Amino acid sequence: MNVKTGRDPALGTAPVGKLFWKLALPAIAAQLVNVLYNIVDRIYIGHIPVYGAAALTGVGVTMPAIMIISAFAALVSAGGAPRVSMLMGKGAPDSAERIIGTCTFTLCAISLALTLIMQLFAVPILRLFGASDATLPYALEYISIYSLGTIFVQLSLGLNAFITAQGFSTTSMLTVTIGAALNIVLDPLFMFVFGMGVRGAALATILSQAVSCAWVVRFLCSEKSTLRLRVKNLLPDMKLLLPCLALGLSPFLMQITENLVAVSFNVTLLRFAGDTAVGAVTVLTTTMSLCMQLLHGLTQGAQPIMSFNYGAGNGQRVRETFRILFISCLTGSMLVWAMCMRFPGAVAGMFTPDAELSSYTAWAMRIYMAASGIFGIQIACQQSFVALGQAKVAIFLALLRKVILLIPLILLLPRLGIFKNAAFAVFFAEPVADTLAVCTTAAMFFTRFGKLTAGAENA
């Protein structure tokens, strides 16, 4: 790394395939380990004696609230990180550091606002998200503690993106690994040894996130980081922040609309099939998040290379990086699809010993995940638009699958009378929306990608 210019020669000169996997593998590991935060909680909660199934469903109802917290971290960092990479490619490290400082202040401000909202309005929010009388107490126990750690979640997720943007993929992976490993240890200790149950799971999670947060801040303030977090840059600069928010709006909307999808599933299934179906969709969305995190790990490996070389005017390396990303994402989504189609009962059994809930989830999984094999195509194309700074197109594609297609299908299909089983109709909305979204996204991407990379070379 050239400290004066902020350029990393490897991003512009190293063999793309080797560089991609060097960045992607730690990012994938970090993303998959990050899933453990939620998966471990849900597995332990589902195995609580007597009330485990109800508690699992209750904690599932809190997931939209947790998604909102993560979405705001993405709004700031997923837009800020590509801009930092582009500025590194242009040799402007001072501007890149000012972006990091501005984004840090913004993350802290958002965290305080979200904490107040969650603490003051938890009950109506959880009711809106699909909590029933039976599941509300467990949902309230979890979110009332979890929301107190919002600032740790925001900073650990948000600032870690700036570590990845500099090419420090191993350090980025350790951020998540440290917290997840601690969570795995603390969960059974607080839940079963100390007898805290659901509250113990929430406390273990926020303490683990606090440790991850401390690790991230320490690294960015140290001399090991090429771009450093400096006190003088913490005052927000709106001229720098607004372009970051514009670019981060696409991943933000992806997560917010994922939240709307979760609420739509919860409310519709509660009406047509009851708490068992809501518990099943908790397991299904967790499984889908496993697929999503795998794919996002791949895109995080590609993004610094694509953004850097797009900023440097090297269209050939951008195209080569996308080719590797596309093949990798499609392969990854197909592997997850095969696992869910072949072993749905085993996947469901990981989360709960309850025979009724496990059997219902296995049945629903083959419907819900039917088109997940091709989902990698949409992620590769959509996130490449983000890496190339194409905010408007990326925002449209983020809205397409969930707001334009999936949510209306969830609400309409069980009411049209086409299917005898209303619950089947709700779950079937997912593969229909996935298929339509993949076709549209691929068509838009491949008609624009060549012009974008050619334009970079001529800039």
For each of these PLM feature ranges, what is it?
Residues N34, N38-I45, S70-S77, A81, ...:
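Alpha-helical transmembrane segments and their lipid-water interface positions
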Residues L32, L36-T57, L126-D133, L189-M196, ...:
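Helix-terminus/linker motif at the lipid-water interface of multi-pass membrane proteins
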Residues M1-P26, V84-I151, V193-L249, M306-A371, ...:
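Short alpha-helical transmembrane segments in multi-pass integral membrane proteins
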Residues L11-Y51, P64-G79, R83, C108-T115, ...:
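N-terminal transmembrane alpha-helices
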Residues K22-D41, I145, G179, S208-S212, ...:
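Transmembrane helical elements of multi-pass membrane transporters/channels
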Residues A53-P64, A139-I143, A202, A273-L290, ...:
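Small-residue hotspots at the loop-to-helix junctions and early N-terminal turns
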Residues S77, Y146-T164, S172-A180, A201-A214, ...:
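Short runs within selected transmembrane alpha-helices of multi-pass transporters and secretion channels
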Residues L56-L116, V153-S172, A280-A338, R342-P344, ...:
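Small-residue-rich hydrophobic transmembrane alpha-helices
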